[in-house]
Regions:
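A structural signal for leucine-rich repeat
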Residues: 119, 143-152, 169-176, 192-199, ...
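Short, loop-centered acidic/histidine patches that primarily coordinate divalent metals
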Residues: 343, 371-374, 391-393, 400-405, ...
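Conserved hydrophobic beta-strand positions in leucine-rich repeat
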Residues: 42, 83-85, 128-131, 156-160, ...
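C-terminal region signature
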Residues: 426-444
């Protein structure tokens, strides 16, 4: 290591995923010790094993406090442009009964703690991430946003997780382009302060943010947004004229208003929306819809002539809900790719069993289908698939996904009959396993 160019060594040290290794390097080599002052990135994570050792009577006296390690590392690296400090996700499983109520050794959004190190590095800091220990932070309201906004004029990316945040004293941060708040209790019920103080945001991620009442996102430069909302807010509004990618998950808002004319990639998961108002999407190419009332949502959706790639699913399937596959093409007539989730498939197959599949010209434009099957009666399922194949004359690819706990014998008997019925189609079948499906056979 001593023979490497200093610039390369600094780059290697800056890329370490755990900056505790940087401290070990300082002890191992005089050269490394001198070069650590030029490190540009600092990442320190409190692991579950470290936490347990710090609590055990046998080992706690031999464990250096986490905050002390961090302060020492910051003091040895004054040129930092990226800082990430947090607790490992495994600490979420720690019980409240196992924690001293007055402990603050892992209360990382404590303003007193942050004041010890932030002023030393704020001049060059471009990215800051703090992931707090919820058990210690949930009952302590933090003024850290005010401190960060007063110190870090050049900050471009900010991420805070697992904390109770006040917006009192928050100053505008005009250079901040990316903000992530995850599992946060936020004292900004309408998001007015977020809109006012972060006007240049291009990326906004709000995941499990509580304390919201009537939130409105009003950001002129926003391009990408992830927003998962609890059932508390009665209305949700997004005004973002430059937004191109939106992933929105909510429960039952009485009002959902979207003014996002440039949206091209949209994932919407909503149990029910009484009032869903959107302006027509002229650029929307990729759409993912999930709802407990899929038919009602489709009825409220504006014409989606630009949509080419479409995914639909029903969150809570019941036999009384009537979702016809043809209804999709009344709203999205130019879709060439269709992914049908298991709930939507059940509803559509149930409607087919009662009344068949109506002709739609748009069905003839479909090129690819991914069907997440739930097979109750193999003959009904086959009849539904065959009817789809008859109507979709330009279909070239069809994938059938089965439940991982399903009947493999059923699947193996269904596949040969499908391929024999329509050999012109390229067939695939596989198993649904979380976000990534397992393909058992490709190009049958």
């Amino acid at each position: 290591m001593d023979d490497l160019p200093p610039s390369l060594v600094v780059d290697i040290l800056s890329r370490l995923t755990d900056s505790a290794d940087v401290a070990r390097c300082r002890v191992a080599s005089k050269t490394l010790n001198s070069l650590t002052r030029e490190v540009r990135s600092l990442n320190l994570l409190c692991t579950l094993s470290r936490y347990l050792k710090s609590r055990s009577p046998e080992t706690k006296d031999h464990v250096t406090p986490f905050k002390a390690i961090f302060n020492n590392l910051v003091g040895q690296a004054p040129c930092l442009n990226s800082i990430s400090i947090g607790v490992d996700k495994s600490l979420r499983n720690i019980s409240y009964d196992d924690v001293d109520d007055e402990s603050d050794d892992l209360y990382l959004t404590d303003v007193g703690f942050v004041k010890e190190w932030l002023p030393k590095v704020c001049g060059d800091l471009g990215k800051l991430s703090i992931s707090d220990f919820w058990i210690q932070s949930c009952w302590r309201k933090s003024q850290i946003l005010s401190l960060i906004s007063s110190c870090c004029n050049g900050l471009m990316e900010l991420e805070v997780k697992n904390a109770w945040l006040s917006v009192d004293g928050l100053n505008p941060m005009t250079r901040l382009t990316s903000l992530t708040l995850e599992f946060i209790r936020l004292e900004d019920e309408d998001l007015n302060k977020v809109n006012e103080c972060f006007p240049s945001l291009q990326v906004l991620n709000l995941v499990g943010v509580g304390g919201l009442k009537d939130p409105k996102i009003h950001l002129l430069h926003l391009k990408s947004c992830l927003w998962t909302v609890s059932n508390a807010p009665l209305s949700l509004t997004i005004f973002a004229p430059n937004l191109v990618k939106l992933r929105l998950k909510c429960i039952k808002p009485k009002s959902l208003v979207l003014d996002t004319p440039l949206l091209s990639d949209f994932h919407l998961s909503v149990e029910e929306a009484s009032d869903f108002r959107v302006k027509e999407f002229h650029n929307l190419g990729n759409l993912h819809l999930e709802s407990s009332s899929l038919c009602c949502l489709l009825d409220m959706f504006p014409s989606g002539k630009s949509v080419r790639k479409l995914t639909v699913n029903s969150l809570k399937w019941t036999a009384t809900i009537k979702f016809r596959l043809e209804a999709v093409f009344d709203v999205f007539p130019n879709a060439t790719y269709l992914n049908i989730g298991p709930g939507a498939w059940c509803e559509a197959e149930n409607c087919f069993r009662k009344g068949g599949l109506e002709d739609r010209n748009a069905l003839k434009e479909l090129r690819e289908i991914v069907a997440n099957l739930v097979v109750y009666d193999i003959e009904v399922t086959l009849s539904f698939i065959f009817s789809i194949l008859d109507k979709c004359t330009k279909l070239s690819d069809m994938a059938l996904l089965f439940h991982p706990k399903g009947d493999y014998k059923l699947a193996r008997s269904l596949i040969p009959r499908c391929t024999a019925y329509c050999p012109r189609v390229k067939w695939r079948w596989g198993i649904r396993e979380g976000p990534k499906d397992t393909w058992v056979s490709v190009g049958m």
